[in-house]
A protein has these predicted regions:
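Hydrophobic face of amphipathic alpha-helices that form TPR/SEL1-like repeat modules
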Residues: 29, 66-76, 106-115, 144-151
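Canonical positions in the second alpha-helix
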Residues: 50, 98, 132-133, 169
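Short helix-capping/linker turns of helical repeat alpha-solenoids
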Residues: 55-56, 74, 100-103, 115-117, ...
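TPR/TPR-like (Sel1-like) alpha-helical repeat modules
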Residues: 160-173
Length: 179
């Protein structure tokens, strides 16, 4: 029986051998299809391929956000410790690569640490990684960090700083947070 790492390697090789650009793969993945673990793993391999081939950053960011819109939980929940280790390393690598151009990578990395298993959970990463995402202009993190600062969640409370950050928000997320 093949290991998860071997199966993922085969998926990656098949995607690369297709000769199609990553953007051609993106539309076939939907929230419904990503509930299936095999589809999610394939989508992660497509995301890596997009990063390897320098696909358009906005398209890659949007695809990354889609595959990590809670669908990763369906994949990792049944993994044993060895499989989880591979999953963790792969997810962290992809988050790091996306974080080079998008705050979405930093925010997802922080979220992964806050939800991790097998001794990897570490809440101390959540706020700093979200703050990096906010500093990169990732709208969801900008609003979240403002709120956390104001309330003192995951960081030292600083109402003044929270209010300053709220006042600077211009995104639709700011409206959701009650600006």
């Amino acid at each position: 029986m093949k290991t998860l790492k071997e199966k993922f390697g085969e998926l990656s090789a098949r995607i690369k051998a297709s000769g199609q650009p990553a953007r051609a793969w993106f539309p076939q993945y939907t929230p419904a299809s990503l509930l299936n673990a095999e589809n999610w793993w394939e989508a992660l391999a497509v995301c890596e391929y997009a990063l390897d081939t320098k696909e358009d950053e906005k398209l890659t960011e949007d695809f990354f956000e889609l595959i990590f819109s809670a669908f990763d939980c369906n994949v990792e929940v049944d993994l044993n410790a060895e499989e989880y280790e591979f999953w963790w390393e792969k997810v962290m690598q992809v988050c790091d690569r996306v974080a080079e151009f998008s705050g979405a990578g930093w925010a997802q990395k922080g979220a992964q640490y806050s939800e991790a298993r097998y001794g990897k959970r570490d809440m101390s990463y959540l706020f700093p990684y979200y703050e990096k995402a906010a500093d990169m202009g990732w709208a969801e993190a900008e609003a979240t960090v403002a709120y956390w600062r104001y309330m003192g969640f995951y960081c030292e409370q600083d109402k003044e700083e929270g209010e300053r950050r709220f006042a600077a928000l211009t995104s639709p997320e700011a409206i959701l947070w009650g600006k």
